[in-house]
Amino acid sequence: MFTESDYEKLHQIMAESPEKEELLTKLLHSHRMDISTISHEIRNPLTLIYSTLQIIEASNPEVLNIRHWSDLHSDIEYMKQLLEELSAYNNGQRLSPSSTNFDIFLKKIALSFASSIIETDIEFISRIEPGLPVMPADSIKLQEVLLNLLGNARDAVLIHQSTYSPQIHFHAWKDHSNLIISVSDNGCGIAPEHLSAIFEPFVTYKSSGTGLGLPLSRRIIEAHGGTLTVHSEPDLPDCQVKTTFTLTIPIP
């Protein structure tokens, strides 16, 4: 699979001449088709295996007591998740834009996330500045990006034992010709040696996950003509924000 840096180099080469652009466009299309085909071919037998396990359980409930039976279920669920995220990553640059009122859109996301952490001790601070644009965007994919970033922040503050209240900040504002959205937390932070790799596919420093969430998020934002960056200082005191992901999308 191509990394983000690979794609950047390919696009630089494509800009050199129409002939190179045509050739590499065909190559990239073929690459995406290969990933889609592989995902499809694996998903079908995996679904059959999962269905067979359910039939076995229904007919023979005693198998639930077999050692590692639950691990088998977990492994299959992981494979299903991996295939879904791989397919999503492959299609990350394909947008279906529609007119999006970002004031309404972001407030709905903030409300949805706040509801999901209501039973935790997390303090969620949302600040949606007035005057946000109404502009074309793929709201479904942007929602996926923002909920992924907020979910990562939630995980970071929950696994980090601190004497301070866990906090997540969600801030959106308009800066000249850009829409800017940031997600910050005072969790564990990201080690400096890991920062350069977190947007690469299959790189993860969590105990669970596929390592495709952040690469997919960056791909979606770049498809909107924007950027997704991160700044983290894990050595700061627990009372301070340690990690901030900043999403910038140009306003037409």
PLM regions: where:
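Short beta-strand/loop element within the Bergerat-fold HATPase_c
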Residues: 164-177
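Conserved DHp (HisKA) dimerization/phosphotransfer helix of two-component histidine kinases, i.e.
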Residues: 2, 66-116
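Short alpha-helical Gxxx[C/S/T] motif in the catalytic ATP-binding
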Residues: 213, 217
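Conserved catalytic submotifs in the C-terminal HATPase_c
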Residues: 118, 123-133
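Conserved signal-transmission helix
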Residues: 1-30
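Short conserved segment of the HATPase_c
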Residues: 190-201
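Conserved glycine-rich
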Residues: 226, 230-233
